[in-house]
Amino acid sequence: MRKFYTLFSREVRGYFHSPIAYIVLIFFLIVSGIDFYFQVSFMNQRQVQYTIQEAFFNSVFFWFAFVLIFPLITMRLFAEEFKLGTIEPLTTVPVRDWQVVLAKFFGALVFYIILWIPTLLYFAIFLKVTNEPAAHSAGAYAGSYLMLLLLGMFYLSIGCLTSVLTRNQIIAAIISFCAITLLFFLGLVQFILLDVSSETRDLLGYFSAIEHMGTFSRGVIDTRPIVLYVSMTIVMLTLTHQAFQSRKWRL
């Protein structure tokens, strides 16, 4: 466990010594801040049936930033190590391959969680200024951030897999972006194709991140997306472990 913690600490520190991490952080805070401002402005002009918290987590700005951050967070995880040759010491010291994979994954997950902490201030400021809560209940907040965690775990695991397949960070980012975007738009097919059967629509809805976020942001916790994203994260990390072992033996 001590070896895992050492690797994990190394990964977390690596983010805060990397310029790209601060670029991602600044980009995300700017886009999320603009998103929150526009949602508040829109709701001041019109009567709506949803809360500012629901609007924030289901807007175009939100999904634009959300899809973009994962390739940027994960592109360096393995690709940079293979390119610089710093992966070789990890293959000779007495650490297990799964410890390396999980340390990189959880290091990325910690940075991802840190990105979302400032958004809690948005809702606190909204409550302070308007004297009204941004959500109907605490469950709505919990559901929103739980879905952020689940989606984040899944998309980060995809980024881990794409990063271990190449030594070029840009290629890793492009592959990750394409894979995540494809999965994202798969959930939109049910809204685009109007002539599909109800069974097909339900199946596509099962994979729709937008629908899942819409449900959880209302405080409705559905166990099916939880099972889906946790199981798919495990699958992606297992594939990453296998790919890492394969590349390690070719060094």
Where do the language-model regions lie?
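Long, hydrophobic alpha-helical segments
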Residues: 57-80
